[in-house]
Amino acid sequence: MWLYYLLKTMSTVISWLPYKAVVVIGKGMGHLYHKIAKKQRVRAEETIRERLGYSQEQAEATIKSLFVKLGITFMEIMYMPALNKDNIRSLVTFDRPEVLWDALKEKHGVVMLACHMDNWEWLGAALALNGFPLSAVEKPQPNRVYSDFMNELRKGVGQEIFSRGTSEILGCARAMKKGRMLGLIADQDGGYDGIFVPFLGKMASTPNGPAYFSRKFKAPIVPIFIVRKPDGYGHKAIVRDPIHYEFTGDQKLDDYNVTLKMTQEVEKIIKEYPDNWLWFQHRWNTPYTPQEEEKQPDEK
């Protein structure tokens, strides 16, 4: 339990700081992280060169900016107990919140599509504190104590949390039936159960959860991404147009098409804000084989 109390104490102390101090300290931590995390840094630089065609100089500059942002993000996560309905509006601004409200009015629930951009934890916090009925699925970390601490922070700002490996499917279904927003991170490797679609020029196994819940409940998928403001202080939440599941009678094709559309939205935001995405994650971990190619439906 020592780790829990350490994290709790750190979070309490950091929450007392002015937000500007949180950002300044975070920048320093990010610079340090960039120097010591050689494995992640090299992997990120290699990936961005391969996927976006960057030169070594461009890759190094972009990934350094990413690491600095990650340092700020760590501090901001510890700062989450200080967030409330009053200050969140100045820290995270939404460009088109009406799109989210209109999607909720369809009364089928909403699949909120997010990715590992910037501080995705604050995206969930901002949605919940702005009154959106948000439920989300979290992937348990190897350290159970850390996962419990993070879930405590998430619930503290009003999110309903389901953990993978429990009865999360049932919980998600109930949330959708209640007309809530279901937050799903869909830029991770989907394993052998995922749907292979092109992603940044390479076939990638993509989680099938958004397609499943959109199909099951006839719910719109609303891509929403958070990016850090240029000066490092605060964030902007970018809301894209809803994606609706199209029923043709061929479920496999329909799942593929909606997954392709949402993946293309993730691609667009990454290319627009490349130093906000987590380039060192193992996104293409599941190999794409000729057998998988035969399984993919023809694109229309």
What is the role of each PLM region?
Residues M1-A114, G156-G158:
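Membrane-anchoring hydrophobic helices of lipid-metabolizing enzymes
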Residues K39, F94, D118, R144-V145, ...:
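Residue-level recognition of alpha-helix initiation/capping sites
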Residues E106-T166, C172, D189-I195, G232:
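Catalytic core of membrane glycerolipid acyltransferases/transacylases, capturing the structured
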Residues Y5, Q40, V92, R164, ...:
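Soluble or luminal CAZymes and related metallo-dependent hydrolases
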Residues N87-V92, K139, G158-R164, L200-G201, ...:
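Short, flexible loop segments at the rims of nucleotide/cofactor-binding pockets, characterized by
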